Amino acid sequence: MIRTEEMLLNVGPQHPSTHGVFRLVIKIDGEIIKEATPVIGYLHRGTEKIAESLQYTQIIPYTDRMDYLSAMTNNYVICHAVETMMGLEIPERAEYLRVLAMELGRIASHLVWWGTNLLDIGAVSPFLYAFREREMIINLLNELCGARLTFNYMRVGGVKWDAPDGWIEKVEEFVPYMREQLAGYHDLVSGNEIFLNRVKGVGIYSEEDAISYSLSGANLRCTGVNWDLRKDEPYSIYDRFDFDIPVGSVGDAWDRYVCRMKEIEESLKIVEQAVQQFPKEGAVLAKVPKIIKAPKGEAFVRIESPRGEIGCYIASDGKKEPYRLKFRRPSFYNLQILPKLLKGENIANLITILGGVDIVLGEVDG
């Protein structure tokens, strides 16, 4: 009888497939993972505590640096929370610009996930195609707000700048181009036998597991739970758009892949409709004081980011800074199921499973 010895192995914190400073301590017996322990906090910056000494507008750039692949949704959630407390009515043109910015950001975020996830499991060319299209989106957002990654675009009451001349037309032209490229992505990857063998039946969890671990986004919907805040608790102007919510059935890495790829298609639908409905004129910022003071009280709002439900709780004592601010960061919750998924798996599936969960370390650590 062959006797094997268990070994502790560190994955990270400097490891290309973790996409950030994330450490995973795994106990392996041969090639089987017996135990996995995530070690987080390497990127903790104390955002919530810092916010207690900042004016509300000053907090917005800090949200850019949480989920830095989807900064627009982070901008929105803090603004939405303050607007809810103040009872502000947002100009219609600003709402459309917000939706366009958030949905373009969602597509760009999923493209990063698609390209890097496939690169990690051995497919090189998809990474190049994904970043080619992402660069086009980044250029569009750069024209809109003057930044490529950390946008600081949204403001309490609307947005900082109106769309430049010709910008809406460029977005309109991008939609059919992206649809064509997406079909090419499926031809290249989605039916590839090697890829299917790497993802089908790997990292399975049930609907009950997803709910008990407070998963959200594609990590929840891959189990068959049809829940998306843009549909189920519409915010902004999402109730004006016709789009579907992709769901899976098995809850494996393949279902998570399919959900995110279909989400790109649905985001393109939203962008297309937003362009068609875009108001020809109007203000982009409500009349708000230069120094914003939220009234005494509390507010909690939540929205759908590319990684799931991001929430913002604010307690105000009537001053220009929040008394307490708390973010519900979806990557932090989604990461909790990783030890359960990895236990008993072959070590070769580790990166497939981690990539399928799609965490961003700036958001995990706060």
Curated annotation (Swiss-Prot):
Record-level GO cellular component terms: plasma membrane
Gene3D superfamilies listed in its UniProt record: Cytochrome-c3 Hydrogenase, chain B
Record key words, sorted: Cell membrane, Membrane, NAD, Quinone, Translocase, Transport
EC number assigned by the record: 7.1.1.-
Primary site of residence: membrane
MF terms (GO), sorted A to Z: NAD binding; NADH:ubiquinone reductase (non-electrogenic) activity; quinone binding
Domain of life: Bacteria
Catalytic activity: a quinone + NADH + 5 H(+)(in) = a quinol + NAD(+) + 4 H(+)(out)
Subcellular localization: Cell membrane
Membrane topology: Peripheral membrane protein
Pfam families: Complex1_49kDa
Function comment: NDH-1 shuttles electrons from NADH, via FMN and iron-sulfur (Fe-S) centers, to quinones in the respiratory chain. The immediate electron acceptor for the enzyme in this species is believed to be a menaquinone. Couples the redox reaction to proton translocation (for every two electrons transferred, four hydrogen ions are translocated across the cytoplasmic membrane), and thus conserves the redox energy in a proton gradient.
Assembly, per entry: NDH-1 is composed of 14 different subunits. Subunits NuoB, C, D, E, F, and G constitute the peripheral sector of the complex.
Family affiliation: Belongs to the complex I 49 kDa subunit family.
Protein name: NADH-quinone oxidoreductase subunit D
Source organism (scientific name): Bacillus cereus (strain ATCC 10987 / NRS 248)
Gene that specifies this protein: nuoD
